[in-house]
Amino acid sequence: MALSIGAACGSNDAAPAAAASPAAPVTTSEVTGTVPRNAIVTLMPAEPVPMPAGPAVMDQYSKTFVPNVLYVRVGQPVEFRNSEDMPHNVTVIRRGSGTEVFNVSTEPQQKYVHTFDRVSQFDVTCDIHPGMQATLIAVQSPLATVAGDDGRFTLSNVKVGSYKLSLTFEGRTVEQPLEVSQARTEVRVSP
């Protein structure tokens, strides 16, 4: 499987200006592409990105996980709260492998803290209330998303610069350098 990376400029349908003025330098880009479906797409900046100051939070409220999709950094504590007056539990299973990471009871107004140690997607459920479901995605960088079922993804407002592009899918990770220097950078994975 190979990565194909190209730069594309956005279209400009406006009429040309009477006098040409210097173009403003590109400072941010949109990184788009087609990769394996449901792959975790991560851009790692050349400079380290500080870990968020506090834990990420997934709450149990009104028989719902809030938020129902949560991105966290690998190594960042995640606080699973129960803000209700009824007991719940939190079961976390690694998507793809079916490996149970943990299954803990969360009593009313209590919390459980866990730190994820690898890039992966996780299914979060409550065994007591089967309708409660969420997704947790652990990533190395705040510049991350999950490709859709069609393999398409978009990362907006990416600063121009050097990155390591990381794709995690089907239990493996593929990495390659990526230079973001255009208004739009296109990424494709070809077999």
List where the protein language model places each region.
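Bacterial N-terminal signal peptides
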Residues: M1-G6
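Extracytoplasmic copper-binding redox domains, predominantly the cupredoxin/blue-copper superfamily
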Residues: C9-P191
